[in-house]
Amino acid sequence: MLILTRRIGETLMVGDEVTVTVLGVKGNQVRIGVNAPKEIAVHREEIYQRIQREKQEQGEPGNS
């Protein structure tokens, strides 16, 4: 895992087309903005896991 330190307003690049910008810090919460092409899905981890779980459940035999 790469660990980076950024200040509010600073950005990091993921590949050539994705940017992640620190928008604010309040207590133990960090607000970030992600700019990515439409074809790249961006989700919070818990949402991504739910999507994957739902896909898996739909693919199981006996589920309609």
Swiss-Prot record:
Disulfide bonds: none annotated. Signal peptide: none annotated. GO terms for molecular function: mRNA 5'-UTR binding. Its main location: cytoplasm. One of its GO terms (cellular component) is cytosol. InterPro entries: CsrA (IPR003751), CsrA_sf (IPR036107). GO terms for biological process: mRNA catabolic process; negative regulation of translational initiation; positive regulation of translational initiation; regulation of carbohydrate metabolic process. Gene3D superfamilies: Translational regulator CsrA. Keywords: Activator, Cytoplasm, Repressor, RNA-binding, Translation regulation. It is found in: Cytoplasm. NCBIfam families: csrA, PRK01712.1. A key translational regulator that binds mRNA to regulate translation initiation and/or mRNA stability. Mediates global changes in gene expression, shifting from rapid growth to stress survival by linking envelope stress, the stringent response and the catabolite repression systems. Usually binds in the 5'-UTR; binding at or near the Shine-Dalgarno sequence prevents ribosome-binding, repressing translation, binding elsewhere in the 5'-UTR can activate translation and/or stabilize the mRNA. Its function is antagonized by small RNA(s). Homodimer; the beta-strands of each monomer intercalate to form a hydrophobic core, while the alpha-helices form wings that extend away from the core. Belongs to the CsrA/RsmA family. This is Translational regulator CsrA.
